[in-house]
Regions:
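Long extracytoplasmic/lumenal interhelical loops at the membrane interface
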Residues: 89-126, 146-149, 153
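Juxtamembrane loop-helix boundary motifs flanking transmembrane segments in multi-pass membrane proteins
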Residues: 77, 81, 107-115, 181
Length: 234
């Protein structure tokens, strides 16, 4: 059913970002719940079949895949944005041109989809790697909260929330570097967009709540100690 919903989302929105996020998150949670690799393989197969079917009928997705193969080949048309992103990253080098000295305005939608390009240009590979390391720590702590949760619902919820952030970072980083097609997903807590920022902060609040519950000492039940004593006296 989730596969069908994801396909409908791709067909209606003519974009595979939200569908990819939904399907990959659910697939990961199914694996966490069952531990069965076969479900992962079946899910990946369905994802490949659905993605190929939508690719055949979506001109927008075909262009994005073409940009991955060779963005510079279409520099004057639909390859301009990813080409400028690659130029910005290469211009940044290892240490960047300096905070505030870059030209993110040359990359269309740099404040949203391509925010990592602006960071890479001004802070270089070192600065961009530091940002990604912070996200990695955040994701790791999310999975740690999942392992520490005391009930199965909390474990699955925390794992799914951490996986949502991980998928977004992986897909966005691959997209801005032209290793993956751009999906329209935003960089959590950084890209412009009120609804995305609000959703990610709600996600963060849920993770903090689960972590707090896991670290809270177990409540002492005095009645549990009285019952055996009462039974012994009787």
């Amino acid at each position: 059913m989730v596969w069908g919903i994801a396909i409908v989302i791709m067909a209606v929105s003519d974009d595979f970002g939200p569908a990819l996020l939904l399907f990959a998150t659910v697939l990961g949670m199914v694996y966490f719940a069952t531990g069965r690799t076969s479900w992962m393989l079946i899910g990946l197969g369905l994802m490949a079949v659905g993605g190929y079917a939508v690719y055949q009928v979506s001109d927008k997705i075909q262009k994005r895949v073409a940009n991955v193969i060779d963005p510079l080949a279409n520099f004057e048309t639909f390859g301009y944005q990813p080409s400028q992103a690659l130029f910005g990253l290469s211009w940044g080098g290892m240490t960047g041109v300096g905070l505030g000295y870059g030209h993110p305005e040359l990359v269309p939608v740099a404040h949203s989809d391509y925010i990592l390009v602006a960071i890479g240009e001004e802070l270089g590979f070192v600065g961009l790697a530091a940002v990604l390391c912070l996200f990695a720590i955040f994701i790791t702590r999310g999975f740690h909260a999942a392992m520490q949760a005391r009930d199965s619902y909390g474990k699955l919820l925390a794992a799914g929330l951490a996986l949502t952030i991980a998928i977004q970072i992986f897909v966005v980083t691959g997209g801005v570097s032209s290793l993956l097609p751009m999906t329209g997903l935003t960089t959590p807590f950084m890209s412009a967009g009120g609804s995305a920022i609000m959703a990610n902060y709600i996600l963060l609040a849920l993770l903090l709540r689960i972590s707090n519950s896991a670290n809270r000492p177990a409540e002492f039940d005095a009645n549990a100690l009285r019952r055996p004593r009462a039974a012994a006296v009787s």
